[in-house]
């Protein structure tokens, strides 16, 4: 059963939040986040600013999957991770 847009947004947010909080990420997490960002980019109906966010996330995941020092890479991108998680959570707020 394919994931709907909200499920993909939630999973992408969860992966980025995990990177942000744990300061580590696996190659498979980067690859999964990159695939999610790409499929979301292919969706119609998103405004240009969030499409730019998906592109930035995709670039982050491509570089992160190849980076020699994952912890340092995440620390260098901590501000971006904060912004991306907030943006994604605004699109799909967690149930309270």
Predicted regions and their residues:
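Amphipathic alpha-helical interaction modules
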Residues: 19-63
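Charged low-complexity stretches with an acidic bias
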Residues: 56-96
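Alpha-helix boundary/N-cap detector
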Residues: 3, 7, 28, 45-48, ...
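Short terminal alpha-helical segments
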Residues: 1-31, 78-93
């Amino acid at each position: 059963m394919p994931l709907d847009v909200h499920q993909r947004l939630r999973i992408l947010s969860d992966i980025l939040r995990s990177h942000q909080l744990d300061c580590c990420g696996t190659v498979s997490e980067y690859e999964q986040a990159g695939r999610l960002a790409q499929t979301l980019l292919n969706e119609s109906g998103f405004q240009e600013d969030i499409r730019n966010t998906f592109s930035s996330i995709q670039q982050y995941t491509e570089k992160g999957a190849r980076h020699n020092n994952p912890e340092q890479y995440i620390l260098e991108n901590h501000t971006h991770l904060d912004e991306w998680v907030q943006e994604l959570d605004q699109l799909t707020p967690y149930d309270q």
